[in-house]
Amino acid sequence: YKRQALGIPWRMRSVRERFEREVVDYFTDSYFRGRTPAPCTRCNSRIKWPCLAAEADALGIRYIATGHYFRITSAGGKRYVTRAADNRKDQSYYLWDLPQEVLDRVLTPMGTVIKRNIVEELADRRESMGVCFLEGRPCRDFLRSRDKTEALRPGPIIDSAGHRLGTHDGAALYTIGQKKGLDLPPGWAVVAIDTAANRIVAGEEKLLLHRTLEVGECRLVESDEVFGARDIRAVIRGIGRNPEGYAAVFPAASGIRIELEDPAWAPAAGQPVVLYRGERVVGGGILERYYYCLL
């Protein structure tokens, strides 16, 4: 936006090294471990919001705001990330990991507006989409540029019985549920990835239906509100289809265990699982394991 039209002073701080370490390296390492990361979520909790808060502190400014589409609501003395009025552009899923000390000072100017009204004001600016640091490159080209150990090499595609089906270009280049770029039988997809052995397991799509999820790196706004509740919904983005119905959440050694009323299709380790109660984000975490696992 033309900041001059609003009379807003401009200050810039470089956080390149921190971004490289916290987001880009995390993204790369996750894929090389056979996981499917969500870099935007990590950037929000590790870079954008804490750096913005720190800069505001240095200037003696109490409140902070961005152009994200979400709202803040309060309940029981807690602040909650809440879905935006524009459901098509809602970004609450990517903000589940923001701590209370940040939410306490957040203003959400975009939370109650419809994006098409804003687009009319910004008609000369392209909408940002995708992973910013890829700069338009395919993800696999980026990963090849970061392959320092020559891990990306051809390997076997097998079925659950160990029968060879074909050859892949490097296990880290694929994700759970993927079909594109693989010569698989009709109705089959990637069901497991073993980067240590450089192999991919393929199988029927029904093998990707999971009801039980184990989630780590959790943040719950109020655990008593989540455990035992019967109106929690779990949202999982990525290549898979999001589960319908409600979810039951239980404490577990690794974080939380989620039992889905209806199965999720193709959830991938490394993806955020975000818990909603109505419009409010009540918690979330990173998917570690699911009930059916071939490896």
Where are these regions (language model features)?
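Core alpha/beta nucleotide-donor-binding catalytic domains of modification enzymes
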Residues: 2-123, 134-153, 189
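Short, glycine- and charge-enriched coil/turn segments that flank and shape catalytic ligand pockets
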Residues: 59-60, 73-80, 146-153, 161-163, ...
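Short polybasic amphipathic segments
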Residues: 81, 154-157, 234, 273
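Short, solvent-exposed secondary-structure boundary motifs
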Residues: 84-86, 176-187, 233-241, 264
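Short acidic, glycine-rich loop/turn motifs
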Residues: 85, 157-161, 236-239, 277
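Anionic-ligand-binding alpha/beta catalytic cores of soluble enzymes and soluble regulatory domains
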Residues: 111, 116-221
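Basic, glycine-rich polyanion-binding accessory segments appended to enzymes
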Residues: 194-295
